[in-house]
Regions:
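A short alpha-helical cap/connector motif
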Residues: 1-107, 111-136, 140-218
Length: 218
């Protein structure tokens, strides 16, 4: 059992191996040590169990949770802050990013509505530090009609993040008509290409796992 999974079980969050089994995967894929001083944002507070799990595992870090339910303020404690607002509100997301960002780790465990997931990513990924991580949890809702989902349906979170795979390989997209001498020079491409707007150049990798998507910032 991983340390994170053990802590998750103690707090009763559904991220543990007793339910979704995300925490074992996080210890494998997240590039952080327990003693790192991280700035963490989690979308979706619910009963506060996940926030407490992050706090106890990353014990030197500051945790921010956001939720639309005002009752979630009760889960504030040392090194845990809770702000009330919607992940589908650009002004709210901008304000919390200015107040608390940039972030080392963002976890979207919010409404799981596909439009909300895509919207939050577009608003918040710019506020992830270089080398930081953005996680989308419970991405299986991309296939469920009640969450605006469907198999191969355009604009679901799964289809949105699939499309970003091309952006991970932006060198090929931007360099197809340039001298090959520059093919391995990402800094040159970023500084000199006139086609930067055609794709994101800030995504290092995207990992699709069972139930979660992990995006690493370049």
């Amino acid at each position: 059992m991983s340390n994170l999974d053990r802590i998750a079980k103690q707090h009763g969050t559904d991220k543990s191996s007793e339910i979704h089994n995300y925490c074992v995967k996080y210890e494998k894929y997240l590039p952080f040590n327990r003693y790192d001083e991280l700035n963490i944002l989690e979308i979706g507070v619910l009963n506060g169990k996940s926030l407490k799990t992050w706090k106890d595992y990353f014990y030197r870090s500051k945790i921010l949770g956001i939720d639309i339910n005002p009752d979630c303020k009760q889960y504030e404690e040392e090194n845990i802050r809770v702000e009330i607002g919607s992940q589908y509100d650009a002004n709210f997301l901008s304000n919390i990013s200015k107040m608390y960002g940039p972030f080392d780790l963002i976890i979207d465990d919010g409404s799981h509505m596909n439009s909300h997931v895509n919207f939050s990513f577009e608003c918040l990924f710019d506020h992830v530090k270089s080398g930081g991580i953005y996680v989308v949890e419970d991405c299986g809702t991309a296939y469920w009609p009640e969450y605006e989902g469907g198999y191969l349906k355009p604009d679901t979170s799964i289809e949105n993040f699939k499309s970003l795979v091309d952006d991970v390989n932006f060198r090929g997209l931007m360099n197809y008509n340039k001298p090959n001498v520059h093919a391995r020079r990402e800094d040159w491409l970023i500084e000199n290409s006139h086609n930067v707007s055609m794709c994101r150049i800030d995504i290092e990798s995207i990992n699709f796992l069972n139930g979660i998507i992990i995006i690493t910032k370049r």
